[in-house]
Amino acid sequence: MASQRSDFAPDLYDFIESNDFGEDPLIRAASAAEEGFTQPAAPDLLYGSQNMFGVDDAPLSTPAVVIPPPSPAPEPRGGKAKRSPSAAGSGGPPTPAAAAQPASPAPSPAPGLAAMLKMVHSSVAPGNGRRATGSSSPGGGDAADPVALDSDTETCPGSPQPEFPSSASPGGGSPAPRVRSISISSSSSSSSSMDEDDQADGAGASSSSSSSSDDSDSDEGGEEETPRPRHSQNAAKTPSAAGSPGPSSGGDRPAAGAATPKSCRSGAASPGAPAPAPASAPAPSRPGGGLLPPGARILEYLEGVREANLAKTLERPEPPAGMASPPGRSPHRLPKDQRPKSALAGASKRKRANPRPIPQTQTQAPAEEAPQTAVWDLLDMNSSQATGAAAAAASAPAAASCAPGVYQREPLLTPSGDPWPGSDPPPMGRVRYGGTGDSRDGLWDDPEIVLAASRYAEAQAPVPVFVPEMGDSTKQYNALVRMVFESREAMSWLQNSKLSGQDQNLAQFCQKFIHAPRGHGSFITGSVANPLPHIGDAMAAGNALWALPHAAASVAMSRRYDRTQKSFILQSLRRAYADMAYPRDEAGRPDSLAAVAGYPAQAAAAAASQQQPEAPAPSVRVREAYTRVCAALGPRRKAAAAAAAPGSRAPRPSAFRLRELGDACVLACQAVFEALLRLRGGASAVPGLDPSEIPSPACPPEALCSNPAGLETAALSLYELRDLVERARLLGDSDPTHRLGSDELRLAVRAVLVVARTVAPLVRYNAEGARARASAWTVTQAVFSIPSLVGGMLGEAVSLLAPPTRSQQPSSSSPGGEPFSGSAAAEGSLQTLPPLWPTVPGKQSATVPSSHSQSPQHSQSGGGAGATTATCCRATQTNARSRGQQHQPQKARSPQAAASPAHLSQEAMPGSSSDDRAIHGRPRGKSGKRRSEPLEPAAQAGASASFSSSARGYDPSGPVDSPPAPKRRVATPGHQAPRALGPMPAEGPDRRGGFRRVPRGDCHTPRPSDAACAAYCPPELVAELIDNQLFPEAWRPALTFDPQALATIAARCSGPPARDGARFGELAASGPLRRRAAWMHQIPDPEDVKVVVLYSPLQDEDLLGGLPASRPGGSRREPLWSDLKGGLSALLAALGNRILTKRSHAWAGNWTGAPDVSALNAQGVLLLSTGDLAFTGCVEYLCLRLGSARRKLLVLDAVSTEDWPQDGPAISQYHIYMRAALTPRVACAVRWPRERHLSRAVLTSSTLFGPGLFARAEAAFARLYPDSAPLRLCRSSNVAYTVDTRAGERTRVPLAPREYRQRVLPDYDGCKDMRAQAEGLGFHDPDFEEGAAQSHRAANRWGLGAWLRPVYLACGRRGAGAVEPSELLIPELLSEFCRVALLEPDAEAEPLVLPITEAPRRRAPRVDWEPGFGSRSTSVLHMGATELCLPEPDDELEIDGAGDVELVVEHPGPSPGVAQALRRAPIKIEVVSDDEDGGDWCNPYLS
């Protein structure tokens, strides 16, 4: 604004004299301005339009000098004080002068304005510069008042700029600050009665004065930049007088055009800072020479009068009775109706924004002793200046500094220091909604709101939809702040939180009844997301931290940032609010009380937590834990005497309960030992582990059996010792209070040894059972399992190891049959023992052979508490596999993928009790495992004596889904089928028996587990099981290599005995079993096998094929299509050199019969599926047989790691093993359907199952068999399919042209209907449909169903995972080659592989039709669109056209234009007719 420019009114005195203004007009003009009237002419130039002074700044009745109140007041800035001669004349530092006694203001009226002008003008002595103003001593500024220099920040026109110390500016090298002129209100008289907060707030209240806008304008654009005056060394030594609010003496007022730093608007300069301007600086004068302009002197005088009046009126008023100032707020900020009117008069906007209390004492301090203060910006104006100034009077250094990073625990107020507009609570019956101060009707009685309020009261996390009717928003705000700091996906949750059913209903209710009736989508609601409460709650509380969720949600809602940029902004918000959310004390430690000082609810909780008694020293706690251990395990004479009393019978815990507690004690001892070893770095450094210090048991075993509570107390005490040792390791270096000496560690070891020696008899002197039941070890076993089982095992471990509840009863009252999951300690503490892997109550578990030696007592026990030593991983893997494969019935029938030790023993025991069929209340599902799918029985190897005689089934150490009920077998009375598998004999297996033959040395694949290797089938049972016509005799030895396959066969021997003396019934060769045994008929002699291709089929994929169930007479379910995972269809497509799509003949869903792979079998290639019977045994059998003959087997593995069966085949490194990924996404038509130019391209590399892998395999085959015919893996002749064509429902394709003519043409012999002939022979069909020959002329040339060969692009390992075509960086010429190339069907052609980094060196192959065979272009139907591929000679004719491949139609089938183009050409049809002359024009097969 013009009024705020520093060059305004260069000579006010000359201006008044030249306009002949008298005293009376000026006084009348000022009085009219005070009353709110606007003068029409000259007076309006001085007061109204120029906006220099408002009526509340300088009332005309204000005396020139004011008598201070009882408490000393600062001197007015316009007061007169004489300089000492030395200061005036020499320019050195001024000496302190006595304060002038002010006159009484009562009898002296205010002089007229003209008289004041003459008085001030006459008082200026020539050559003296300007006089000291309003201070009793030079060096104005209050050392104890942080805002003493606030008046200096409001410079007036015609005053020089003061020099600022280096600490008053944020950077020493910063450019000159912008000009900040005074902003004084010139509003009407109604603004004088307005409270200081409303008038100072220029953005919130509608009644704010125009000075706010003027002030903001001056901040942005109406300011000038001038160089800062150089600092004076003399001024640095100028002492300051305390209590003076005026400018520093010895310095001059800022001159016209001088700049005031913006950083000092609110008192940034140090109160005791050196005097800004040098004393020796000459006084500024007019351009023509002379003294300072009188206009500047007038302005300075009036400013001093205003300062004096402000000092009088801003005394601390006494609050009304019963009315206390709110904490953190200045006591002057009272409600409007309670503020004295005098406190509002005479205060400018800047003074109202920073009210200063009257200092009680005036002390003089030298300038060099005053502390330097930090820069205060406008953002810090919300903090209470009054409180800070009062504290500064007592301690100047503490008040003058504003420590960075320490959050002021005060409400966040407006820049003027007032509460935010709209902070008042909404009216009765309404809640906040919309803009500032707006509200809407409350909906407390609505059922949706009532339910939401109940959910909000019980929620521990932020609710996804919040409305004010749900209750206090403090809980929601605090939860949102925690989520912003702790959640990785905070922004995603704020923007798109997942809504449950009830929350979704609430969101729809809010949209319908709250948001929709109130306008469009951009209507102001007060929050940008459903979880956020209204921002008015945060404004009313003055809580700056609650703005964090709103800021984060606003950024999350924005579409101008991507995910990474939003993450950066979120991290920035976290760092900016970190000191507020997690404050620290002066020492840098987290201050929990300071963190919640501004929030009553959190403060109460923090205070309660601070009042808790301090924990004893670690050494004391170690001794107490040792005492509890000895007391808990010691002999209890009272209990023993009560038990020995006649007629009394004390309750005794069950054996299961004791076994649980014994395992818990073992794990507790192991936890303490681990902590001690980590603390000391080794066992030799742990004191107390000396054999001579091993203590004796605390009580005999029989006393321990009646003391389960003592066992639990001992275990809890050991875990407490573990925690103390861990704290010593983690905190001992930084905090000596947590350190443990040698004596404490020795006592901890002593406690562990006491527990160990006392509990050892209870666990039969063996800790293997407890180790197998450790919950952490169970999870570790799960995550280290093979990829196909890791998901199921981990899920099973997590579900079974549920966290213990806090409401459980003590262990002494818990039933003995319940698994131990941790209960309250004897002292009533809430500590619980870590959960154990549950076991089946009352069951005997067999032992597992391990490298750890077992005592004779344990090995002979056969049962009891110590028999729980089976590793839990077996049960976990069993249940994980059975659950994970219930959705794949075909795969679930494979013994490799679904074996379990529990099923193994149960299925061979028809006499198992019904209790074994459901464990822990989980009945067997309909799709559960069949009894023929056992798991390795090696878990019973240690109990061979009881294996053959016990009628009970094997029960794992962990609960698993129980095996299904045995099928009803047709057996003779008294006949019971034997079990097929048993433990490995001690003397070793028989060579004719059934067991795993795992090669020695390293293997390409994971080695089977010990349990799988320990399974054994006696030779007499093997001979009976494999003697069946279903199994070719040459391949029967492979069955003996797979005990799981033998168990599967035994489970299906459910019929009556085939002959006398047979142990098993007759084998029921069902359809699934035949499909699984079909691989044995591929190659009759195992000696002819040279290459084995391993694959994992998708659901309902097998080499037998068959009609799908959707067709009449079909029984096979339609296989599932997958774009990501490849099965048998993808395997055969790669071996057959063709593209696999869902509509092509290569997909199993289109098969109507079994595919023909005899061409591959003739080359010695065996296709073996993971679901085939004896998959593991076949591979190991071939490896052994060929290795014994000194031949190497070539194994191509296309099974993904997730599908590799547990205990799969072990392939020795002696053989050649190649592994590659099998996926339909190698075809660009599947990966990028929209890239039409790549529809006939296929990606290949050495890691993909395709030509890249085949090239390596063919080279290795040539080295292994140099005299044999070369291996050809990627040829069209390798595979033939059985599909539905116009030649028949089960047509083998490709159908040779001769056979095609024999099967199709006779149907149209003698047919006179040419339209029927054209439709039946497919004259107007596309030449190729989904890559296969479809039209009559194409079938007559290459055969019906013959497929086009793809173009392979060698993309390398990185290109195989490309997400977009641009990542491949395909050259333009190569892309054009793929678009134009059309490789005609050729059964013996090699694959065309082109490097993706080079342009092709050959012309793209085309299809050319001879004259007389229709159109010269070839029509190709792919993905519902027909393309016309022109022959090569026409390529040069259409350079300027659309290209060689033109997209004609976008819907399935040929377009009318294509059909019309085909009809124009001569159509030649060969038919056998007796009554019609057939010419050459109708025979398309003539060459």
Swiss-Prot record:
Composition skew (Pro residues), residue ranges: 66-75, 273-285
GO cellular component labels: host cell nucleus
GO molecular function: DNA binding
The record's account of how the chain is modified after translation: A long stretch of serine residues may be a major site of phosphorylation.
Biological processes, Gene Ontology terms: DNA-templated viral transcription; positive regulation of DNA-templated transcription
Chain intervals with Low complexity compositional bias: 165-193, 201-213, 235-272, 807-829, 849-860, 867-877, 938-951
InterPro entries referenced in this protein's UniProt entry, alphabetically: Herpes_ICP4_C, Herpes_ICP4_N
Keywords associated with the record: DNA-binding, Early protein, Host nucleus, Phosphoprotein, Transcription, Transcription regulation
Signal sequence coordinates: none
Biased composition (Acidic residues): 214-224
UniProt-annotated stretches for the region Disordered: 41-295, 310-370, 803-1007
Subcellular location: Host nucleus
Protein name per Swiss-Prot or TrEMBL: Major viral transcription factor ICP4 homolog
Species annotation: Equine herpesvirus 1 (strain V592)
